[in-house]
Amino acid sequence: MSIRFVAADAHWRVAPLPGLSAAQKDWLTRGGSLTAHLRALGAVAVRVTREGVALPWPDEHAALGLAPRAPVWVREVVLAVEGVPFVAAHSVAPLAASAGVWQAMRRLRTRPLAELLYSDSSVARSSLVSRRLTARHPLYRLAACAIESLPPHALVARRSVFERHGAPLMVTECMLPALWAHLATVSGAGGSGDWSAHPRVREHGRPLEHTASRAHPATRASDEQRR
């Protein structure tokens, strides 16, 4: 399965925009769990900002193969590292799937969605796509609620579709300015968190494949301990 897009919407790209920074290109194409990558920077907390039934965004329904006004289950969270918001995430699944194949997403509360996506061998993931966000996009407005102020046209986001037993779940992640500021500080100090010091598997342009084998090592170790 691949993400299906409306031909008129050319904003989402398989390869990151050439004008983005090296750090942005790196984080937009990292495979595995984003939560696990954030944990390498510090303690991660999940704050749920919205959860319930809604309508898909204009650039979501076609990608999920849904009718424009088909109801979906939405989960929106902010991922904070050491108390500072680094990522605003928006996940959406067909309403029927959220009560069936993906029903566990309704019970996560403040646990990360990665717990479902990277410990189940029946879950597969599409390639990653990314784009720059403007104030007109609903994800930009979601990000604005997570922090006090946003510079115009300063946000980038990525998305992919996870599939389990034929049911899709789309995850869109918007990186916030504090993430780039932190990476720049760590990189400038030559610390162990330097983004360039840790090569990662790149997911853009890859076909759908199972996620359990691609989980971050820390995630796999945690899963094994729970067993």
From Swiss-Prot:
<dbReference type="InterPro" id="IPR007440">
    <property type="entry name" value="Chorismate--pyruvate_lyase"/>
</dbReference>
<dbReference type="GO" id="GO:0042866">
    <property type="term" value="P:pyruvate biosynthetic process"/>
</dbReference>
<dbReference type="InterPro" id="IPR028978">
    <property type="entry name" value="Chorismate_lyase_/UTRA_dom_sf"/>
</dbReference>
<dbReference type="GO" id="GO:0006744">
    <property type="term" value="P:ubiquinone biosynthetic process"/>
</dbReference>
<feature type="binding site">
    <location>
        <position position="173"/>
    </location>
    <ligand>
        <name>substrate</name>
    </ligand>
</feature>
<dbReference type="GO" id="GO:0008813">
    <property type="term" value="F:chorismate lyase activity"/>
</dbReference>
<keyword id="KW-0963">Cytoplasm</keyword>
<feature type="binding site">
    <location>
        <position position="113"/>
    </location>
    <ligand>
        <name>substrate</name>
    </ligand>
</feature>
<comment type="pathway">
    <text>Cofactor biosynthesis; ubiquinone biosynthesis.</text>
</comment>
<comment type="similarity">
    <text>Belongs to the UbiC family.</text>
</comment>
<comment type="function">
    <text>Removes the pyruvyl group from chorismate, with concomitant aromatization of the ring, to provide 4-hydroxybenzoate (4HB) for the ubiquinone pathway.</text>
</comment>
<feature type="region of interest" description="Disordered">
    <location>
        <begin position="192"/>
        <end position="227"/>
    </location>
</feature>
<dbReference type="GO" id="GO:0005829">
    <property type="term" value="C:cytosol"/>
</dbReference>
<keyword id="KW-0456">Lyase</keyword>
<feature type="compositionally biased region" description="Basic and acidic residues">
    <location>
        <begin position="200"/>
        <end position="212"/>
    </location>
</feature>
<keyword id="KW-0670">Pyruvate</keyword>
<feature type="binding site">
    <location>
        <position position="75"/>
    </location>
    <ligand>
        <name>substrate</name>
    </ligand>
</feature>
<keyword id="KW-0831">Ubiquinone biosynthesis</keyword>
<protein>
    <recommendedName>
        <fullName>Probable chorismate pyruvate-lyase</fullName>
        <ecNumber>4.1.3.40</ecNumber>
    </recommendedName>
</protein>
<dbReference type="Pfam" id="PF04345">
    <property type="entry name" value="Chor_lyase"/>
</dbReference>
